[in-house]
C-alpha cells in the first residue's frame, strides 16, 4: 500500500498538485440521493454528520466556499461504507483523488485527467490487463432518459451499470420488464448500448438522434471532441471509448463530462471500475454561497477518484509472479523489483550481546547521511545470521550489517546477491551509498514504470509545509 501511495503522490505532484485534505466530518448532503451505505453519525450536539462516501463531494464543498480560483490538488484517504453488521465499525476503503479547479471550463482539464488515467494504466500489474478508458457526457444520459416516461427513469438508472457489463442480457431485460417497460422500449435501450472507439461511437450515436436531440447535444459532443483531441496531445495512445449509457455518480457531473477506467471480468458479467471522474461545475455551484452581484466568479472543476486497493492488488500479483524471476538473474542484475515494499535499506545486528552502543552509533551515522536503517536490540543479539537474513529478505531490506567484538571492521551482507564484504567502519557510509545507488539503477532497469522515489525517501518539502492551504 505504501509503495502505491508514494507512486500516486509523486505522480500527482509531478503535475503541480498540492495535498488538500477536507475535514473528516461534513453536514448531511442531498448529493448522494438515496444511497444506503453512507455512514451517518451524531455529533455531541445531536446533529447528524456524514463520514466521506467519496473524496469529491467533501472537497467540492470546501472549495466552493474558499477563495481558490486556480488549484490542482490531490488527496489519498479513506472513504467509508456502512458496515452490514449492526454496530460494527464503518468499513474503510482507501481512495485517491486528483482535482483541477480553474476559472474556465477548459477541455484541457479533462484531457489532463485522461492522460493521468493513461499513465496509471502503465503500472506493472495494470499494464497487462484489459482496462478501458471511457468517456461520456451527462447531457447524453439526460437525452437518453428523456426518451422514456419518467416512471421508468429510476429503474433505468439502476439497470444501466449492469447493462454495460451484460449488454442485452436476459436478466437485465427482465429487471426493466418487471418495472413495466414494454418490449419496444427495451429495444431502444439495446440500441443505445454503444461501446465503441470514440469516433465510431459518435457516428453511431448521431444516427440514433432526432434533429432536436442533435441540437441539444451539439455543444456537449463538440466539447468531448476537443477533450479527445487534447488528450492525444498529452500522448494518450490507448483507445478512448464513448459510452452513452455511462451513469456512475452522474448526479455529481450534471451538464459535464463523465469518465472512467473499467474492465470486464467474470466472462463479461461484471464491470470492474478502477477510477471514475468528470466535470463537476454544477456541484461547485450548488455548494457556493449565494452570489451578490458579480462579486464572485463561478469556479469550474474536474476530478478523478481512484480505487487504490485495486491498484495494490494488481501490483501484488505482478510482484508475486515476477520477483522469483528477478532473483534468478545473474548476480549483478538481481533485484526485488522497485515495487517491493522496503521497510528500510540497512539492518544493523551483532553476533553477540554487548554491542548495542556501537550499533546505535552506526545507525545514527547512517541516518545523518540519508540512509534508512534499523538496529537489533539486545534481546535479539546473537540471533543466527541465517534467520536475520531471511527476515531482512521478507521485509525488503537490502543490507545486513553485522558487528563483531574486538574489531573495527563490520561484515556487510547483501541480502539479494548473498555476497559478503569486510568494510571498515569509517568507510561504511560511502560503501553503502555506492551499493544502494547501484541497486536502484538495477531496480529502474527492471520495468519501464517505477516509483519516482525510493520507498525510504522522506516526504517532500511541499508535504511537510511548503504549501499552506487557506481553505477552511
Identify what each model region corresponds to:
Residues 38-46, 149-185, 262-265:
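Acidic, His- and aromatic-enriched active-site or binding-groove loops in soluble protein domains
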Residues 132-149:
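Glycine-rich, mobile lid/loop segments that gate access to catalytic sites or pores
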Residues 134, 149, 153, 165, ...:
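Intrinsic-disorder-associated interaction segments
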Residues 17-19:
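N-terminal alpha-helical transmembrane segments of multi-pass membrane transport
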Residues 3-15, 25-27, 34, 46, ...:
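Positively charged, Gly/Ser-enriched RNA/tRNA-binding surfaces
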Amino acid at each position: 500500500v505504501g509503495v502505491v501511495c508514494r507512486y500516486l503522490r509523486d505522480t500527482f505532484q509531478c503535475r503541480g498538485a498540492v495535498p488538500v485534505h477536507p475535514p473528516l466530518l461534513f453536514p448531511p448532503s442531498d448529493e448522494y440521493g438515496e444511497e444506503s451505505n453512507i455512514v451517518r453519525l451524531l455529533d455531541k450536539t445531536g446533529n447528524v454528520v456524514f463520514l466521506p462516501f467519496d473524496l469529491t463531494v467533501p472537497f467540492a464543498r470546501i472549495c466552493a466556499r474558499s477563495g481558490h480560483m486556480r488549484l490542482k490538488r490531490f488527496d489519498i484517504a479513506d472513504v467509508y461504507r456502512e458496515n452490514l453488521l449492526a454496530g460494527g465499525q464503518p468499513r474503510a476503503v482507501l481512495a485517491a483523488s486528483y482535482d483541477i479547479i480553474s476559472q474556465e471550463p477548459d477541455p484541457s482539464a479533462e484531457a489532463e485527467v485522461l492522460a493521468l488515467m493513461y499513465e496509471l494504466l502503465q503500472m506493472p500489474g495494470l499494464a497487462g490487463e484489459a482496462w478501458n478508458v471511457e468517456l461520456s457526457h451527462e447531457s447524453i444520459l439526460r437525452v437518453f432518459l428523456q426518451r422514456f416516461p419518467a416512471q421508468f427513469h429510476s429503474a433505468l438508472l439502476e439497470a444501466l451499470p449492469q447493462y454495460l457489463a451484460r449488454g442485452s442480457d436476459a436478466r437485465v431485460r427482465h429487471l426493466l420488464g418487471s418495472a413495466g417497460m414494454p418490449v419496444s422500449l427495451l429495444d431502444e435501450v439495446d440500441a443505445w448500448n454503444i461501446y465503441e472507439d470514440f469516433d465510431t461511437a459518435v457516428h453511431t450515436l448521431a444516427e440514433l438522434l432526432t434533429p432536436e436531440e442533435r441540437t441539444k447535444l451539439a455543444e456537449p459532443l463538440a466539447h468531448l471532441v476537443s477533450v479527445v483531441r487534447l488528450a492525444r496531445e498529452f500522448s494518450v495512445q490507448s483507445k478512448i471509448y464513448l459510452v452513452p449509457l455511462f451513469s456512475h455518480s452522474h448526479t455529481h457531473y450534471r451538464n459535464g463530462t463523465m469518465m472512467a477506467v473499467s474492465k470486464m471480468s467474470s466472462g463479461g458479467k461484471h464491470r470492474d471500475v478502477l477510477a471514475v471522474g468528470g466535470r463537476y461545475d454544477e456541484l461547485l455551484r450548488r455548494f457556493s454561497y449565494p452570489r451578490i452581484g458579480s462579486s464572485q466568479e463561478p469556479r469550474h472543476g474536474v476530478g478523478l477518484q481512484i480505487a487504490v486497493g485495486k491498484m495494490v492488488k494488481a501490483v501484488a500479483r505482478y510482484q508475486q509472479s515476477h520477483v522469483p524471476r528477478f532473483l534468478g538473474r545473474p548476480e549483478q542484475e538481481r533485484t526485488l523489483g522497485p515495487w517491493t515494499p522496503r521497510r528500510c535499506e540497512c539492518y544493523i545486528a551483532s553476533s553477540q550481546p554487548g554491542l548495542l552502543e556501537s550499533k546505535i552509533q552506526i545507525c545514527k551515522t547512517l541516518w545523518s547521511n540519508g540512509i534508512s536503517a534499523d538496529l537489533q536490540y539486545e534481546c535479539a543479539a546473537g540471533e543466527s545470521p541465517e534467520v536475520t537474513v531471511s527476515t531482512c529478505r521478507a521485509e525488503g531490506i537490502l543490507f545486513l550489517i553485522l558487528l563483531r567484538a574486538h574489531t573495527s571492521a563490520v561484515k556487510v551482507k547483501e541480502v539479494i546477491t548473498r555476497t559478503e564484504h569486510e568494510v571498515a567502519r569509517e568507510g561504511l557510509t560511502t560503501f553503502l551509498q555506492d551499493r544502494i545507488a547501484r541497486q536502484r539503477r538495477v531496480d529502474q532497469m527492471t520495468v519501464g514504470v517505477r516509483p519516482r522515489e525510493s520507498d525510504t525517501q522522506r516526504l517532500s518539502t511541499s508535504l511537510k509545509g511548503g504549501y499552506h492551504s487557506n481553505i477552511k
